Amino acid sequence: MPNSNHYDIIIVGAGPAGISTALHLANLAPELVSRTLILEKARHPRPKLCGGGILPDAEVVLCQLGLDITEVPHVDVDWAHFDFDGQGMRMRGEKKGLFAFRVIRRHEFDTWLAAKARERGFIIHENTAVKSITATEAGVVLSTDQGEYHAAVVVGADGSNSVVRRAIIPHEDLHVARLLEIVTESKPEKSFHKQSDSFFDFVVIPQGIQGYVWDFPAVEKGQPVRVRGIYDSNVLSFKADVPLRFALDEELGRHGLHLSDYKLEGHPIRWFDAKSDFSAPRVLLVGDAAGVDALFGEGISIALGYGGFAAQAIQDAFTKKDFSLRGYKRSILQAELGKALRWRTWFAKFFYRLRSARFQAFVWRKMGWFIEWAVRAFFIEWTRRQEKHKRADT
């Protein structure tokens, strides 16, 4: 067991990326569990802004970890609609699937994940905020509001505003999307949206907003609610013609709602840039701290996916006594996860510059067959492609 606040591995952040890293590590190198600490700045259950979509890729990773997502309160979304001004196409997460994806509330999902980590022997120190880290050849020192910690390896799983990332990459271009979100009651009598479906509407693109408005069904304290919001990828340099809150209020008005009646919250999402650094000697990044989906801002499956690569890099570091972690970025970029993320970033930069309302209407209303093929071939189902590669190699 470690002495005092000295550990072999410290994971900063007890969200999906951090817990996935821990659980993958338990599978790969169970001897490291007792030498690993997870630090969380808040206490579970803590509020967390997120649309809450759980794609099939996320379920595959959870299944590989021996976890069953249906233990968490959730809604099975019947169809996912991709529209322009209320008209477009629909699809499901799997071509012959029974639903599009599941929707959870992050405070419940993250609490469940943390409990699973504790069940497998991990220690989590909550209410412990990391203020700074200093990496040297001998190890890493973490300064927190609860004192000083020491580790051989640190995993930055502390989100888009990552303290760990700033420590190893102090000067970089910002790659941060913007998101606003509200939770409303379910009012089927006022909305033309089917209550069992989710909706992505790209009607805001002609206004210079590089994204969409969304409307998901969810369950909160056992009651049906709708999670609604607006996403701006911010992948291009031009600014939107209108503020995000104005565009969101306009969309809500179409459903008999008013933004002023609800609590509006916002948060950034760091999107994936293949040119960026994901590690430094003794330190690596996962989840939002590394970068997630630029196209839709989808982060849960991506965060869970990073965990396997981080755990493998950590195991290799201790086995080889080489803590440079220089192979970590290459392992991600060469994997189907990295390929999917690169495609999403490229397509976001291409697609969101096409502001013509006529073009957007044509794409979503007439090209659904092509969109569904492209989404399956390049953006999702990366876990399935990765498994095929593994089987081919064995």
What residue ranges belong to the model's regions?
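Central beta-strand plus flanking loop segment that forms part of the substrate or channel wall
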Residues: 62, 161, 167-201, 257, ...
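Conserved FAD/dinucleotide-binding core of flavoprotein oxidoreductases
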Residues: 207-268, 300-301, 317
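Beta1/beta-strand and adjacent pyrophosphate-binding region of the FAD-binding site
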Residues: 2-17
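Conserved mid-domain beta->alpha element of the FAD-binding
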Residues: 273-340
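Conserved N-terminal helical subregion
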Residues: 60, 75-76, 81-167, 173-177
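Glycine-rich FAD pyrophosphate-binding loop
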Residues: 10-14, 26-50
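N-terminal FAD cofactor-binding segment of flavoenzymes
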Residues: 43-82, 184
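C-terminal helical "tail/cap" subdomain of flavin- and related membrane-associated enzymes
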Residues: 312-394
